Amino acid sequence: MKQLTILGSTGSIGCSTLDVVRHNPEHFRVVALVAGKNVTRMVEQCLEFSPRYAVMDDEASAKLLKTMLQQQGSRTEVLSGQQAACDMAALEEVDQVMAAIVGAAGLLPTLAAIRAGKTILLANKESLVTCGRLFMDAVKQSKAQLLPVDSEHNAIFQSLPQPIQHNLGYADLEQNGVVSILLTGSGGPFRETPLRDLATMTPDQACRHPNWSMGRKISVDSATMMNKGLEYIEARWLFNASASQMEVLIHPQSVIHSMVRYQDGSVLAQLGEPDMRTPIAHTMAWPNRVNSGVKPLDFCKLSALTFAAPDYERYPCLKLAMEAFEQGQAATTALNAANEITVAAFLAQQIRFTDIAALNLSVLEKMDMREPQCVDDVLSVDANASEVARKEVMRLAS
């Protein structure tokens, strides 16, 4: 039985992870749950899964959780703060850590799990976008096993040979017969919109994703294809891929989640319903398989599958991300931070849709691109880029 810590248990990935546990109580036991401020959901999770520990981000939330659990007769020990989250990620009895805390808050707990040599089910995008080199160096030193949860990276992982899976981030693709990795994306809701009309697109229009249901921030990232740009950065680190070994493809139906092209002409793809429980269950059970609760893909109901190359005039954010990777971790960190500010400004109707890419570029041009040497350096770049982005938004919005 695998012992599990879930970082970010009350978020959507955390809830889906617990659903997989629910379907497979004989395979998984929850040791620790870590969350932000959602006490109500954490109470429900603690009562159902009886973890030894529950950690809330702040003391007030932890106090409330403790009171509510005691009233219900729960014996779960309640803790608070980032150090407690890091401790849960490194617990001796834990085999697997689901790293699903969103944003910079997830960096140190994920790094703690890596340094403790755990199997890390990686769902925190920022880990590799901002700390790719730092994290991959730590993986090598501690011999931790990274398993990607993101549907595209998980699809690539499943389509790669075992020697690469067991030495993720360091195995040589070419030596293992791999020519390239094909990263697919839907192209978002504005795939067919005339370029001249993009400036007038509203937040509500940007948030109507055709295939996946997701939050407003990531919906906008899908519309700009910044999400694919960030996934490109992650894939370069995860699979030790050069620029020439990466292809980005628009695949509007989102049925093929990504592919791998081999030297002999074969292309291996992973298909499935667009449901995050599939990649989550895959990483949890790897190298075995368990029931995820996802309905089987019905091939008879599929429409034609189509593919196209991305147009960088339509998706300048994608190009920005690809170029930022070549500049280093300071650039990818700054781009990610700037994008959070510009997307929030677009959602608040302070700037136009087309201003997102323009402002992201403007921030990159103003930043000091010295390579960060530790997580604190990364957080400093993140904070500086956010500040520059806020000023750029104010300049444009005034």
UniProtKB/Swiss-Prot annotation:
Enzyme type, top EC level: oxidoreductase
Keyword presence, Ribonucleoprotein: no
Gene: dxr
Source organism per UniProt: Shigella flexneri
Record function comment: Catalyzes the NADPH-dependent rearrangement and reduction of 1-deoxy-D-xylulose-5-phosphate (DXP) to 2-C-methyl-D-erythritol 4-phosphate (MEP).
NCBIfam families associated with the record: Dxr (TIGR00243), PRK05447.1-1 (NF003938), PRK12464.1 (NF009114)
Reactions listed under catalytic activity: 2-C-methyl-D-erythritol 4-phosphate + NADP(+) = 1-deoxy-D-xylulose 5-phosphate + NADPH + H(+)
GO biological process: isopentenyl diphosphate biosynthetic process, methylerythritol 4-phosphate pathway involved in terpenoid biosynthetic process
Binding of NADPH, residues: 10-13, 36-38, 124, 126, 215
Protein origin, superkingdom: Bacteria
Keyword Manganese appears in the UniProt entry: yes
Recorded GO MF terms: 1-deoxy-D-xylulose-5-phosphate reductoisomerase activity; manganese ion binding; NADPH binding
Binding site for Mn(2+): 150, 152, 231
Name recorded for this polypeptide: 1-deoxy-D-xylulose 5-phosphate reductoisomerase
InterPro entries reported for this sequence: DXP_reductoisomerase, DXP_reductoisomerase_C, DXP_reductoisomerase_N, DXPR_C, DXPR_C_sf, NAD(P)-bd_dom_sf
